[in-house]
Amino acid sequence: MAAAGAGSGRAAVSRSRPPPARFRGCLAGALLGDCLGAVFEGRSVVKLPDLLSFLRGLEPPGGEGEPAGSARRETLSYTDDTAMSRCVVQSLLAKREFDEVDMAKRFAEEYKKEPNRGYGMAVVNVFKKLLSPQCSDVFEPARAQFNGKGSYGNGGAMRVAGIPLTYSDVQDVKKFAKLSAELTHANSLGYNGAILQALAVHLALQGEVSRETFLEQLISHMEDIEADDKSLTDARALGFEDLPFSRRLKKIKEFLELSSVPKEDVLFELGNGIAALRSVPTAIYSFLRCMEADPDIPEHYNNLQRTIIYCISLGGDTNTIATMAGAIAGAYYGEEQVPPSWEQSCEAFQETQKMANSLHELYCQQL
């Protein structure tokens, strides 16, 4: 069990108390991104007219006086992204702190209960080992993956939102994001992606901030995180340059200074794949890009909706990129931008709201 350290200076630092609407927005945004994105997952090309037509189908029939979302209530299923995100949240709420043994057990039991949520084969092997009575170290199965190199996929990042919704101290956010990811992703390119995603949600939760300041803070954190020996060794072993996440954040900064960026450039530089390095920066770029209007997306969609639409339009690992961007945007804009017709079309949306309220209570207790 890993509790937050008293030495982190929590008592000496006055921390803001974000409103519960941001917590509900974060988990709702993540759920929307997963459920909506899953419909288009794996497509190399997602045509925007097809996506917009699908979204119009979520609206209730006009003129019938039905409540929003009633036409397609809970018809969109969530995937392993949300299943594992829920495990993170449920563990934090049950234990009132990060507990690696409890969280690992919940991951494995959730897979055993519902194995058809779209889990990758590699992580299934980890779950099977975690379910074994002989497993004495819950981090060992992940360390053994890929001949001891560990996974650098985006699975740690996609589920991490519960960490910054529990811990207000940025050092705790980094520490427990890393530990939660290491239960399945032992390569630094995997867990550093989870840290980056957690930091993005943490910053978004604090409220209004410029795109420049948001990126500068992320770059500052990641340059420090990626300078350790393991991060440098792992990146070089996989043929990447040093500080790969930091470099992509700087590329995002360049993109945001341009009047327009073709989708092809975004895919080439940032990606739309299952590696954390090829998806977490993409989610962050999507959030920041969609702070402003997009000429290709109808104006009646708000910032949160625009963010999710843009993510899905990139194709590839649509649900994971959209769930990460949705969590960031939801934390930033709050539940006010969560359209009822979208939310109520998603499986377990009411449970998600309840979990968000409980996380807000836990977060405030730790201030």
Curated annotation (Swiss-Prot):
BP terms from Gene Ontology: DNA repair; negative regulation of necroptotic process; peptidyl-serine ADP-deribosylation
Names of the cofactor(s): Mg(2+)
Catalysed reactions listed for this entry: [(1''->2')-ADP-alpha-D-ribose](n) + H2O = [(1''->2')-ADP-alpha-D-ribose](n-1) + ADP-D-ribose; 1''-O-acetyl-ADP-alpha-D-ribose + H2O = ADP-D-ribose + acetate + H(+); O-(ADP-D-ribosyl)-L-seryl-[protein] + H2O = ADP-D-ribose + L-seryl-[protein]; alpha-NAD(+) + H2O = ADP-D-ribose + nicotinamide + H(+)
Residues annotated as binding Mg(2+) 2: E41, D317, T320
Key words of the record: Chromosome, Cytoplasm, DNA damage, DNA repair, Hydrolase, Magnesium, Metal-binding, Mitochondrion, Nucleus
UniProt xrefs under InterPro entries: ADP-ribosylglycohydrolase, Ribosyl_crysJ1, Ribosyl_crysJ1_sf
Enzyme class: hydrolase
Coarse class of the protein's main subcellular location: nucleus
GO molecular function terms listed in the Swiss-Prot or TrEMBL record: ADP-ribosylserine hydrolase activity; hydrolase activity, hydrolyzing O-glycosyl compounds; magnesium ion binding; O-acetyl-ADP-ribose deacetylase activity; poly(ADP-ribose) glycohydrolase activity
Enzyme Commission numbers on file: 3.5.1.-, 3.2.1.143, 3.2.2.-
Amino acids binding Mg(2+) 1: T79, D80, D81
Subunit structure: Monomer.
General function of this protein: ADP-ribosylhydrolase that preferentially hydrolyzes the scissile alpha-O-linkage attached to the anomeric C1'' position of ADP-ribose and acts on different substrates, such as proteins ADP-ribosylated on serine and threonine, free poly(ADP-ribose) and O-acetyl-ADP-D-ribose. Specifically acts as a serine mono-ADP-ribosylhydrolase by mediating the removal of mono-ADP-ribose attached to serine residues on proteins, thereby playing a key role in DNA damage response. Serine ADP-ribosylation of proteins constitutes the primary form of ADP-ribosylation of proteins in response to DNA damage.
Name of protein: ADP-ribosylhydrolase ARH3
Species this chain originates from: Gallus gallus
